Amino acid sequence: MVCSYKSAVRLLLLLLGYCVVLQAVEKPNILWITAEDMSPTLGCYGDTFATTPNIDKLAKEGVLYSNAFANAPVCSPSRSCLITGCYPTSLSTQQMRSGFSIPKHMRGFPALLRDQGYFTTNNVKTDYNTANYKEIIEASWSENSNSAHWRNRPESSQPFFSIFNLMTSHQSRSMVWPYKQFKKEIQSQILAEDIHAPADVPLPPYYPDTPLIRREMARYYDCVTAMDIQVGIILKQLKNDNLKDNTIIFFFSDHGSGMPRHKRALLDSGMHVPLIIYFPKKWQHLSPYKPGSTTDSLVSFVDFASTILNLTGVINPISMQGKPFLGPNVTTKRSYVYGHRDRVDEVRDLARSVRDSRYLYIRNYMPHLGYNQPTAWPDKGEIRHEFYRLAKEKKMTPEQWHFAGPYRPVEELYDCLNDPRNLKNLAKSKKHKNILGRLRSEHIQHITDTVDLGFLPESEAWTMFGKRSGWELGQSKSIPFNEIRNAAVQVGIASESEFLKNLESENSVVRYWGAIGLTAKKTISNKAKGILKIKLKDPSYATRIEIANALAVHNEINEALPALTDAVNHENLIVVTHAARTIELLGEKAAVAKPAMKKALARAIKIRPPETPATVVLPGDKDLAMFVAFSCHAFLAIFEN
């Protein structure tokens, strides 16, 4: 009897242990469906013009996030953030596109899921914006192709993490392709009754009301509808495979829509994204929200990787800067989300943003450059030229001119609750002085804490980093960041004497920001011009180019051009990209630079033949060569008529 009792106890313990093991290894499947270039223009977000039944149904079954934000208003920095769980500005992957490396231990968070037995698939876009992209792909994905699918896992019981990237709403489809191509390849996918009528399209106040703009906005909505059909197909496959009851589903876009004033802008129209997360009943305990609910909790792309790891029971690496917003032991919510805008293709820029649940603060560090800078690839779209035409004819309201004009405010502040389209800048409002100060301080604290490498010009960054990654150099605290930050913060605010003082610094990056500060001023003295002329041989080419630009902008073009034409034929294509863009923006008054720009163009074409599609991402100098060609073509076209 005693023996039987002991045997029964042993058997019970074994069974309990077996159940514990089963419970320990059971993991949810994760499905990510990512739309390209799409704002929350969905029925479930209150857009009555949108036709999105499949996504709307998912929202009724899941949780809708009303305050979800990208980290950048363009794709490749966003994807760098999503795959690493780190701010691109801390990795030096903030430019589009970047050739800097990241540390080898940053394999991509799906690699950690693979370590735990997950089958991971990516269909199909990568664009991780780093020299290490091949290593990330190899480590992260069991399958990475346009046929990658959870259905290809070797065992049906194996948990999966699958991504489907839908290009249907991408800027190429919504505004760049010729309209005839859009009709053939996108509009043909949707029912005739679902085609959006241009006459009925709701135009935001920052868009002029013309037939062309109406047609293009209706076209964008058609792209969203076609994308919704694809979402429905994927969700149907999941249901048909009897997997919906064990799969957590994320639907989101990589940033705002590809239309003007959306993509590339730190305004809510460029950064606010739809996010819907579905939890089956089995895994409902991992979400604090009930199905069909809406939450206004702030979430950012930097948090997605750590959230997936937390949902699947994987410990977050120390290097991840994001914090989980779902899963066990989530006790705090975000107070702020942060955004960055840097070089995109040939277009140079640097701006930063901070947003809380109500207010958006933007700091433009190159306020002498407008929102609507000329840019080769999007300029293939007719809608861009409609904006140029109306701006030239001065047929724009103040809300439209904010985007189309040649300059930007140094600081912007918007009450997104009462002004969701960001039309009224409150930065100079006495009533909002304390709010402005709080968000400005938060911005300074964030770029300092995260060591924002975007404040280093690219050519200088390459010199500084050497064989180390930007992350490693930033974490070592060997960069004199506070000195650089303080010089940049003066742009648009400080006096001429402060910028001249910065030009005398031993730090080349401080000198660089001193030159930009002078460029951004409406006028400078003859004394300042004289000092700039003396400094034209600065050993840093980035600084030299900006000194020349300051002279050119302030009517000393003849003194400036020799330095620029020298730089445009430099051996380093990062220097060439910088110089070519500077010459391009100077336009007709830089006519003597034509031979140098023709030479730079010929070199660029040899490196990257012009028949290579602009959407094809190539490593190293090949992408830079495309950006050089963009600027050279645009500049030389001025003189063809």
Go through the PLM ranges and name each one.
Residues 2-4, 17-405, 420-441:
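Formylglycine-dependent sulfatase
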Residues 6-14:
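Sec-dependent signal peptide recognition
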Residues 11, 347-349, 409:
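Short beta-strand-initiation
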Residues 25-28, 35, 64, 272, ...:
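Long, internal low-complexity/basic segments
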